[in-house]
Curated annotation (Swiss-Prot):
Alphabetical list of Pfam families matching this protein: Kinase-PPPase
Superkingdom of this protein's organism: Bacteria
Enzyme class: transferase
UniProt EC number: 2.7.11.33, 2.7.4.28
Amino acids binding ADP: 152-159
Annotated protein name in UniProt: Putative phosphoenolpyruvate synthase regulatory protein
Gene Ontology molecular function terms on file: ADP binding; ATP binding; phosphotransferase activity, phosphate group as acceptor; protein serine/threonine kinase activity
InterPro entries according to UniProt: Kinase-pyrophosphorylase (IPR005177), PSRP (IPR026530)
Originating organism: Chromohalobacter salexigens (strain ATCC BAA-138 / DSM 3043 / CIP 106854 / NCIMB 13768 / 1H11)
Keyword Lipoprotein: no
Residue pairs linked by disulfide bridges in the UniProt entry: none
């Protein structure tokens, strides 16, 4: 089964897309084409979009799914008249909340992104700068300022996880790659000197060797770096290090960056400086 889903908003569309994706992810047997339409904030834009929804229904032979967070009632009415299956997130939840809280909603466009905006912005920028400055073991002298230090072999997901933690939660995440330089004379991977004072901040990532080899092949094909033997050896040594020093770790093979991050936060009890956008 193939369907089209529209995520529509009079703001950035982040809320509609995030909630919509979460809902639609529950239907694994449906092949979905996802369309994001932000800033539908005028009647003209609403009419144009309604026409697109109608064209999509004709083309697919099925009415598209329409998930929106539009505040303006006149714009909502235009979208509602289009031939789509409408999931109005705000109207679904605001009415019962108004009743429970005994007060009326302000129905303000972009309100979710305005709450504490200046403070959130500064935390986000600070955390992103920190993640970039401390990527791949670049500045180990700043580890005392880190909320968490991600460790693992090259290409196991440390950098994207660090940036996601910074962008979504304002967490100052550094990351350190475990390499052959950290082997002792007997070929055993030891705790790197730069990390030893911060063992309480360490969280490790590992990955299936076949997946790691595939990822590395995209970067350096036909090299020792991406060979299965090399990947298996590095991962075995890294996981032995994690166990020896009781460093918590997660296998990233089957998890998205979002899942890796939230699982890590739950396990380490890191403090979020703000909630996701």
């Amino acid at each position: 089964m193939s369907r089209t889903a529209f995520f529509i908003s009079d703001g950035t569309g982040i809320t509609a897309e995030t909630l919509g994706r979460s809902l639609l992810a529950q239907f694994e047997g449906v092949d979905l084409t996802l369309v994001v339409k932000p800033y539908i904030d005028t009647l003209e834009k609403a009419h144009d979009l309604a026409a697109i929804i109608a064209q999509t229904a004709d083309r697919d032979g099925e009415r598209p799914i329409v998930i929106d967070t539009i505040v303006d009632q006149s714009i909502r009415d235009i979208i509602a008249a289009a031939p789509g299956f409408k999931v109005d997130i705000f109207s679904t939840f605001l009415a019962p909340l108004e009743e429970e809280l005994a007060t009326h909603s302000t129905y303000t466009v972009g309100r979710t992104h305005a709450i504490g905006r200046d403070d959130v912005y500064m935390h986000r920028i600070d955390a992103v700068h920190f993640a970039l400055d401390n990527d791949d073991g670049a500045r180990t002298h700043q580890y005392d300022q880190a909320d968490v230090i991600l460790v693992g072999v090259s290409r196991c997901g440390k950098t994207p996880t660090s940036l996601y933690l910074a962008l979504q939660f304002g967490i100052r995440a550094a990351n350190y790659p475990l390499t052959e330089d950290d082997l002792d004379e007997d070929g055993v991977l030891n705790m790197p000197k730069a990390l030893a004072p911060y063992r309480h901040k360490l969280f490790a990532l590992t990955i299936d060797p076949r997946r790691l080899a595939a990822i590395r092949s995209e970067r350096r094909p036909n090299s020792r770096y991406c060979s299965m033997d090399q990947c298996m050896q590095e991962l075995q040594q890294a996981e032995a290090l994690f166990r020896r020093y009781h460093i918590p770790y997660i296998d990233t093979t089957r998890f998205s960056i979002e899942e890796i991050s939230t699982r890590m936060i739950a396990e380490t009890h890191l403090t979020r400086r703000f909630s996701p956008r």
